[in-house]
Amino acid sequence: KKFIGIGSALMRQQEVFDGVEERYFFENVVDFINSKVFNSLADEVILLKGARSFGFDQLTELLVKKVHETVLEVNLNAVVDNLNWYRSFLKPETKLVCMIKADAYGAGAVEIAKTLEEHRVDYLAVAVADEGATLRRNGIKSNIMIMNPEMSSFKTLFDYELEPEIYSFRLLDALIKAAEKEGITGYPVHIKFDTGMHRLGFNPRTDIAQLIEKLRHQNALIPRSVFSHFVGSDNNDFDSFSAEQFKLFDEGSKQLQSAFSHRILRHIDNSAGIEHFPERQLDMCRLGLGLYGINPRNNEIINNVSTLKTTILQMRNVPKGETV
């Protein structure tokens, strides 16, 4: 998209680069450094190529200095290593959802999404529709799940082919109405069961009959998956309760599946559950904190992903008794 040529030879051959969207030419490095083009560089990936005689070493130094003194370095290779570590617990056919909400917990959602897409993750998941739209605008084509869809965001969901979590009858009714108004049929959604977390979700004991009735008597939406969330898969003290949760989810999800001819993916294992309950991986698992290097089972680092670096501004020797 952008080409910057330095040197008299390139100055004479400018027409060769007529097909480049943005192109600039300078007689020497000093002219480039003093130009508006250099001062406007921001959020760029820059490839420097040229002989030492051009003095690109001083250019490199100045470009590095343009970076903030406090930076968060994200190691994408470590992300892949963590992904593969958790995949080692899964059967080859088990699908994987990777959580990249809140800008991938500060690691940079677009960059993380591109890396995960390259490594064939089945689903990405973000909190709200705007996050999903940003990924789409940056070329992400993977399935994207929206965990907290807002009723004001339905148009964004449809425009960017984002798949919402459905956790209440109010949300379900509103989304059906919006989809029917747009003439949409068969739009994929993900059904949330509350098996003990008590945040969001349908009660698989008391709500299942009404849920099936509503889903079967419309064709705007289809359940793509059904899922729940372990309360304490990171703590052995909750193992009995986790077993109760799984039993409740297993029964409710099978009842939902029996009402439809197409396959509905089931998932309940999170990062800790993948390691602690591999026998409960079902059709799909959700990988969150573990992807970023934190093992929720012991709070130890698997492969460190993020490193915060800064500069010490000043070191002071303060006499005892002085205020700080």
Regions found by a protein language model. Give the residues of each.
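ATP-dependent carboxylate-amine ligase
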Residues: 1-81, 88, 123, 127-129
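Hydrophobic/aromatic residues located in beta-strands of well-ordered beta-sheets
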Residues: 3, 23, 46, 96, ...
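N-terminal active-site wall of soluble small-molecule enzyme domains
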Residues: 12, 88-175, 276
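Short hydrophobic/aromatic-enriched beta-strand-loop microsegments
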Residues: 20-28, 67-69, 141-150, 163-168, ...
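Short, acidic/turn-prone active-site loops that include or flank metal/cofactor-
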Residues: 25-32, 72-77, 130, 148-152, ...
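Glycine-rich tight-turn/loop motif centered on a GG-T
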Residues: 64-75, 114, 159-164, 238
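Active-site loop/helix belt of alpha/beta enzymes
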Residues: 71, 78-83, 88-89, 102-115, ...
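Short, solvent-exposed secondary-structure boundary/capping segments
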Residues: 320-324
